[in-house]
From Swiss-Prot:
The keyword Phosphoprotein applies. It comes from Saccharomyces cerevisiae (strain ATCC 204508 / S288c) (Baker's yeast). This is AP-1-like transcription factor YAP3. Residues 144-207 form the bZIP domain. Coiled coil: none annotated. It is found in: Cytoplasm; Nucleus. Its main location: cytoplasm.
Length: 330
Protein backbone atom coordinates (compact mmCIF):
# COMPACT_ATOMS: atom_id res chain seq x y z
CA UNK A 1 0.00 0.00 0.00
CA UNK A 2 1.40 3.39 -0.98
CA UNK A 3 0.90 6.80 0.61
CA UNK A 4 -1.39 7.82 -2.28
CA UNK A 5 -3.90 5.13 -1.30
CA UNK A 6 -4.37 6.56 2.22
CA UNK A 7 -7.97 7.40 3.06
CA UNK A 8 -9.22 10.70 4.43
CA UNK A 9 -10.38 8.92 7.60
CA UNK A 10 -6.91 7.67 8.22
CA UNK A 11 -5.63 9.22 11.39
CA UNK A 12 -2.45 7.23 12.01
CA UNK A 13 0.13 5.00 10.48
CA UNK A 14 2.21 2.03 11.49
CA UNK A 15 5.84 1.59 10.66
CA UNK A 16 7.56 -1.75 10.21
CA UNK A 17 11.33 -1.59 10.53
CA UNK A 18 13.35 -4.09 8.63
CA UNK A 19 16.23 -5.42 10.74
CA UNK A 20 18.40 -5.48 7.66
CA UNK A 21 17.96 -1.76 7.16
CA UNK A 22 20.17 -0.02 9.74
CA UNK A 23 19.48 3.48 8.50
CA UNK A 24 15.99 3.60 10.00
CA UNK A 25 16.89 2.26 13.42
CA UNK A 26 16.78 5.77 14.88
CA UNK A 27 13.37 7.18 15.48
CA UNK A 28 12.57 10.75 16.47
CA UNK A 29 10.44 10.40 19.59
CA UNK A 30 9.38 14.03 19.68
CA UNK A 31 6.94 13.33 16.84
CA UNK A 32 5.11 10.62 18.75
CA UNK A 33 3.08 13.12 20.73
CA UNK A 34 2.19 15.45 17.84
CA UNK A 35 -0.77 15.40 15.51
CA UNK A 36 -0.82 13.16 12.45
CA UNK A 37 -0.53 15.94 9.92
CA UNK A 38 2.53 17.45 11.63
CA UNK A 39 4.08 14.04 12.08
CA UNK A 40 3.65 13.28 8.38
CA UNK A 41 5.10 16.66 7.43
CA UNK A 42 8.12 16.28 9.71
CA UNK A 43 8.73 12.69 8.71
CA UNK A 44 8.04 12.38 5.01
CA UNK A 45 10.96 10.07 4.55
CA UNK A 46 9.44 7.51 6.90
CA UNK A 47 6.66 6.77 4.42
CA UNK A 48 8.33 4.37 2.14
CA UNK A 49 7.72 0.92 0.85
CA UNK A 50 8.25 -0.49 4.34
CA UNK A 51 5.49 1.74 5.79
CA UNK A 52 2.00 0.27 5.57
CA UNK A 53 -0.84 2.68 6.39
CA UNK A 54 -3.98 1.35 7.91
CA UNK A 55 -7.37 2.99 8.40
CA UNK A 56 -8.11 4.21 11.90
CA UNK A 57 -11.47 5.82 12.28
CA UNK A 58 -12.38 8.21 15.01
CA UNK A 59 -14.56 5.65 16.81
CA UNK A 60 -12.58 2.60 15.81
CA UNK A 61 -9.08 3.14 17.24
CA UNK A 62 -7.32 -0.19 17.62
CA UNK A 63 -7.38 -1.28 21.24
CA UNK A 64 -4.18 -2.17 23.07
CA UNK A 65 -4.45 -5.09 25.41
CA UNK A 66 -1.68 -6.24 27.76
CA UNK A 67 -2.01 -9.91 28.33
CA UNK A 68 -0.96 -10.60 31.90
CA UNK A 69 0.01 -14.16 31.20
CA UNK A 70 2.97 -13.48 28.98
CA UNK A 71 3.16 -9.66 29.06
CA UNK A 72 2.71 -9.51 25.27
CA UNK A 73 1.26 -6.45 23.61
CA UNK A 74 -1.64 -7.35 21.24
CA UNK A 75 -3.70 -5.28 18.86
CA UNK A 76 -7.38 -6.25 18.79
CA UNK A 77 -8.52 -5.74 15.20
CA UNK A 78 -8.04 -7.47 11.93
CA UNK A 79 -4.78 -5.85 10.96
CA UNK A 80 -2.37 -7.69 8.74
CA UNK A 81 1.33 -7.65 9.72
CA UNK A 82 4.32 -8.68 7.73
CA UNK A 83 6.02 -11.90 8.43
CA UNK A 84 7.72 -12.47 11.75
CA UNK A 85 11.12 -12.54 10.14
CA UNK A 86 10.64 -9.03 8.78
CA UNK A 87 9.11 -7.55 11.95
CA UNK A 88 11.48 -6.01 14.48
CA UNK A 89 9.56 -3.10 16.02
CA UNK A 90 6.14 -1.55 15.78
CA UNK A 91 5.60 2.17 16.34
CA UNK A 92 2.03 3.26 16.91
CA UNK A 93 1.08 6.91 16.69
CA UNK A 94 -2.51 7.34 17.94
CA UNK A 95 -4.57 10.52 17.64
CA UNK A 96 -4.79 11.10 21.34
CA UNK A 97 -1.00 11.59 21.62
CA UNK A 98 -1.01 10.42 25.26
CA UNK A 99 1.75 7.92 24.91
CA UNK A 100 3.55 5.59 22.44
CA UNK A 101 4.55 2.03 22.90
CA UNK A 102 7.43 0.13 21.46
CA UNK A 103 6.96 -3.55 21.00
CA UNK A 104 10.26 -5.32 20.67
CA UNK A 105 10.17 -8.63 18.91
CA UNK A 106 12.71 -10.90 17.34
CA UNK A 107 12.68 -14.17 15.51
CA UNK A 108 12.69 -16.26 18.68
CA UNK A 109 10.04 -14.16 20.52
CA UNK A 110 11.60 -15.05 23.88
CA UNK A 111 10.73 -13.92 27.35
CA UNK A 112 13.48 -11.32 27.55
CA UNK A 113 11.81 -9.23 24.87
CA UNK A 114 8.47 -9.53 26.64
CA UNK A 115 10.02 -8.40 29.91
CA UNK A 116 11.65 -5.37 28.25
CA UNK A 117 8.37 -4.41 26.57
CA UNK A 118 6.49 -4.71 29.82
CA UNK A 119 9.11 -2.65 31.65
CA UNK A 120 8.92 0.14 29.07
CA UNK A 121 5.14 0.09 29.05
CA UNK A 122 4.91 0.24 32.81
CA UNK A 123 7.41 3.11 32.81
CA UNK A 124 5.26 5.13 30.42
CA UNK A 125 2.20 4.46 32.57
CA UNK A 126 3.86 5.88 35.69
CA UNK A 127 4.91 2.59 37.28
CA UNK A 128 8.35 3.11 38.84
CA UNK A 129 10.85 0.25 38.78
CA UNK A 130 11.52 0.77 42.47
CA UNK A 131 7.90 -0.17 43.28
CA UNK A 132 8.28 -3.47 41.50
CA UNK A 133 11.83 -4.30 42.64
CA UNK A 134 12.86 -2.35 45.75
CA UNK A 135 15.93 -4.51 46.25
CA UNK A 136 17.40 -3.24 42.99
CA UNK A 137 17.04 0.40 44.07
CA UNK A 138 18.56 -0.42 47.42
CA UNK A 139 21.52 -2.03 45.72
CA UNK A 140 21.89 1.02 43.50
CA UNK A 141 21.99 3.34 46.55
CA UNK A 142 24.60 1.25 48.36
CA UNK A 143 27.51 2.27 46.07
CA UNK A 144 26.47 5.92 46.35
CA UNK A 145 26.47 5.70 50.15
CA UNK A 146 29.85 3.99 50.17
CA UNK A 147 31.27 6.61 47.81
CA UNK A 148 29.93 9.42 49.98
CA UNK A 149 31.34 7.73 53.08
CA UNK A 150 34.73 7.32 51.42
CA UNK A 151 34.71 10.96 50.34
CA UNK A 152 33.89 12.05 53.88
CA UNK A 153 36.67 9.85 55.25
CA UNK A 154 39.12 11.26 52.69
CA UNK A 155 38.14 14.81 53.58
CA UNK A 156 38.57 14.08 57.31
CA UNK A 157 41.95 12.44 56.70
CA UNK A 158 43.12 15.36 54.56
CA UNK A 159 41.95 17.83 57.20
CA UNK A 160 43.78 15.93 59.95
CA UNK A 161 46.91 15.77 57.79
CA UNK A 162 46.75 19.52 57.13
CA UNK A 163 46.30 20.21 60.84
CA UNK A 164 49.27 18.02 61.75
CA UNK A 165 51.34 19.64 59.04
CA UNK A 166 50.45 23.15 60.22
CA UNK A 167 51.20 22.23 63.85
CA UNK A 168 54.57 20.77 62.85
CA UNK A 169 55.41 23.81 60.75
CA UNK A 170 54.51 26.12 63.62
CA UNK A 171 56.66 24.09 66.02
CA UNK A 172 59.62 24.22 63.64
CA UNK A 173 59.17 27.96 63.15
CA UNK A 174 59.15 28.51 66.92
CA UNK A 175 62.32 26.45 67.29
CA UNK A 176 63.97 28.38 64.47
CA UNK A 177 63.09 31.72 66.07
CA UNK A 178 64.36 30.54 69.45
CA UNK A 179 67.65 29.33 67.96
CA UNK A 180 68.04 32.64 66.16
CA UNK A 181 67.52 34.54 69.41
CA UNK A 182 70.07 32.32 71.15
CA UNK A 183 72.54 32.89 68.34
CA UNK A 184 72.11 36.66 68.58
CA UNK A 185 72.60 36.59 72.36
CA UNK A 186 75.74 34.44 71.99
CA UNK A 187 77.16 36.79 69.38
CA UNK A 188 76.48 39.74 71.67
CA UNK A 189 78.14 37.97 74.60
CA UNK A 190 81.17 37.08 72.47
CA UNK A 191 81.50 40.72 71.41
CA UNK A 192 81.34 41.88 75.04
CA UNK A 193 83.98 39.34 76.07
CA UNK A 194 86.21 40.44 73.20
CA UNK A 195 85.96 44.06 74.35
CA UNK A 196 86.66 43.08 77.95
CA UNK A 197 89.69 41.07 76.86
CA UNK A 198 91.00 44.03 74.89
CA UNK A 199 90.59 46.31 77.89
CA UNK A 200 92.33 43.81 80.19
CA UNK A 201 95.26 43.49 77.79
CA UNK A 202 95.60 47.25 77.57
CA UNK A 203 95.46 47.55 81.36
CA UNK A 204 98.12 44.85 81.73
CA UNK A 205 100.40 46.71 79.36
CA UNK A 206 99.88 49.91 81.33
CA UNK A 207 100.57 48.12 84.59
CA UNK A 208 103.76 46.63 83.20
CA UNK A 209 104.93 50.03 82.08
CA UNK A 210 104.02 51.66 85.39
CA UNK A 211 105.63 48.75 87.26
CA UNK A 212 108.89 49.27 85.42
CA UNK A 213 108.74 52.98 86.13
CA UNK A 214 108.01 52.36 89.81
CA UNK A 215 110.87 49.88 89.99
CA UNK A 216 113.25 52.42 88.53
CA UNK A 217 111.91 55.03 90.92
CA UNK A 218 112.43 52.65 93.82
CA UNK A 219 116.01 52.18 92.75
CA UNK A 220 116.47 55.94 92.59
CA UNK A 221 114.81 56.33 95.99
CA UNK A 222 117.12 53.73 97.42
CA UNK A 223 120.09 55.69 96.21
CA UNK A 224 118.62 58.88 97.63
CA UNK A 225 117.35 57.22 100.79
CA UNK A 226 117.20 59.41 103.89
CA UNK A 227 117.14 57.69 107.26
CA UNK A 228 114.17 58.43 109.44
CA UNK A 229 115.07 59.95 112.80
CA UNK A 230 113.34 58.48 115.89
CA UNK A 231 111.27 60.63 118.17
CA UNK A 232 112.50 61.73 121.56
CA UNK A 233 110.36 59.23 123.43
CA UNK A 234 111.41 56.41 121.12
CA UNK A 235 115.05 57.31 121.57
CA UNK A 236 114.73 57.60 125.33
CA UNK A 237 112.81 54.36 125.70
CA UNK A 238 115.30 52.49 123.56
CA UNK A 239 118.34 53.81 125.37
CA UNK A 240 116.94 53.52 128.90
CA UNK A 241 115.60 50.02 128.31
CA UNK A 242 118.96 48.92 127.07
CA UNK A 243 120.67 50.52 130.07
CA UNK A 244 118.34 48.70 132.46
CA UNK A 245 119.17 45.43 130.82
CA UNK A 246 122.83 46.15 131.09
CA UNK A 247 122.59 47.18 134.75
CA UNK A 248 120.08 44.41 135.54
CA UNK A 249 117.26 46.79 136.37
CA UNK A 250 118.79 48.54 139.34
CA UNK A 251 117.21 51.86 138.34
CA UNK A 252 114.10 52.92 140.25
CA UNK A 253 111.22 55.17 139.35
CA UNK A 254 113.06 58.11 140.82
CA UNK A 255 115.99 57.35 138.55
CA UNK A 256 113.64 57.37 135.53
CA UNK A 257 112.59 60.90 136.39
CA UNK A 258 116.20 61.97 136.67
CA UNK A 259 117.09 60.37 133.34
CA UNK A 260 114.42 62.39 131.61
CA UNK A 261 116.19 65.61 132.47
CA UNK A 262 117.74 67.36 129.55
CA UNK A 263 121.08 68.34 130.95
CA UNK A 264 124.64 68.76 129.80
CA UNK A 265 127.55 68.82 132.16
CA UNK A 266 131.28 68.15 132.49
CA UNK A 267 132.51 65.14 134.32
CA UNK A 268 135.53 64.85 136.60
CA UNK A 269 137.82 64.13 133.66
CA UNK A 270 136.77 67.35 131.98
CA UNK A 271 134.76 65.65 129.25
CA UNK A 272 131.58 67.15 128.03
CA UNK A 273 128.82 64.67 128.86
CA UNK A 274 125.23 64.56 127.50
CA UNK A 275 122.33 62.84 129.15
CA UNK A 276 119.90 60.73 127.07
CA UNK A 277 117.52 63.59 126.24
CA UNK A 278 120.47 65.88 125.49
CA UNK A 279 121.99 63.21 123.25
CA UNK A 280 118.78 62.97 121.25
CA UNK A 281 118.68 66.73 120.71
CA UNK A 282 122.31 66.79 119.65
CA UNK A 283 121.85 63.95 117.15
CA UNK A 284 118.72 65.60 115.77
CA UNK A 285 120.67 68.79 115.03
CA UNK A 286 123.40 66.79 113.32
CA UNK A 287 120.79 64.90 111.17
CA UNK A 288 119.63 68.19 109.73
CA UNK A 289 123.14 68.93 108.56
CA UNK A 290 124.10 65.51 107.28
CA UNK A 291 122.51 62.13 106.59
CA UNK A 292 123.71 59.27 108.72
CA UNK A 293 122.38 56.07 110.22
CA UNK A 294 120.95 57.01 113.58
CA UNK A 295 120.27 53.41 114.42
CA UNK A 296 123.93 52.58 114.03
CA UNK A 297 124.88 55.39 116.39
CA UNK A 298 122.32 54.33 118.98
CA UNK A 299 123.48 50.74 118.88
CA UNK A 300 127.06 51.80 119.41
CA UNK A 301 126.18 54.16 122.28
CA UNK A 302 124.49 51.44 124.25
CA UNK A 303 126.76 50.21 126.99
CA UNK A 304 128.93 53.33 126.90
CA UNK A 305 126.99 55.23 129.57
CA UNK A 306 128.65 57.28 132.26
CA UNK A 307 126.81 56.98 135.52
CA UNK A 308 126.56 60.21 137.45
CA UNK A 309 123.99 61.91 139.58
CA UNK A 310 122.05 62.93 136.41
CA UNK A 311 121.55 59.41 135.15
CA UNK A 312 123.14 57.69 132.18
CA UNK A 313 125.08 60.02 129.93
CA UNK A 314 127.34 59.79 126.89
CA UNK A 315 130.50 61.69 126.17
CA UNK A 316 130.14 64.15 123.36
CA UNK A 317 133.39 63.10 121.78
CA UNK A 318 132.11 59.54 121.51
CA UNK A 319 128.89 60.72 119.88
CA UNK A 320 130.81 62.73 117.28
CA UNK A 321 133.06 59.78 116.49
CA UNK A 322 130.10 57.43 115.97
CA UNK A 323 128.33 59.95 113.74
CA UNK A 324 131.40 60.23 111.53
CA UNK A 325 131.66 56.47 111.36
CA UNK A 326 127.97 56.11 110.43
CA UNK A 327 128.37 58.67 107.68
CA UNK A 328 131.39 56.87 106.19
CA UNK A 329 129.62 53.50 106.29
CA UNK A 330 126.74 54.92 104.33
Amino acid sequence: MTPSNMDDNTSGFMKFINPQCQEEDCCIRNSLFQEDSKCIKQQPDLLSEQTAPFPILEDQCPALNLDRSNNDLLLQNNISFPKGSDLQAIQLTPISGDYSTYVMADNNNNDNDSYSNTNYFSKNNGISPSSRSPSVAHNENVPDDSKAKKKAQNRAAQKAFRERKEARMKELQDKLLESERNRQSLLKEIEELRKANTEINAENRLLLRSGNENFSKDIEDDTNYKYSFPTKDEFFTSMVLESKLNHKGKYSLKDNEIMKRNTQYTDEAGRHVLTVPATWEYLYKLSEERDFDVTYVMSKLQGQECCHTHGPAYPRSLIDFLVEEATLNE
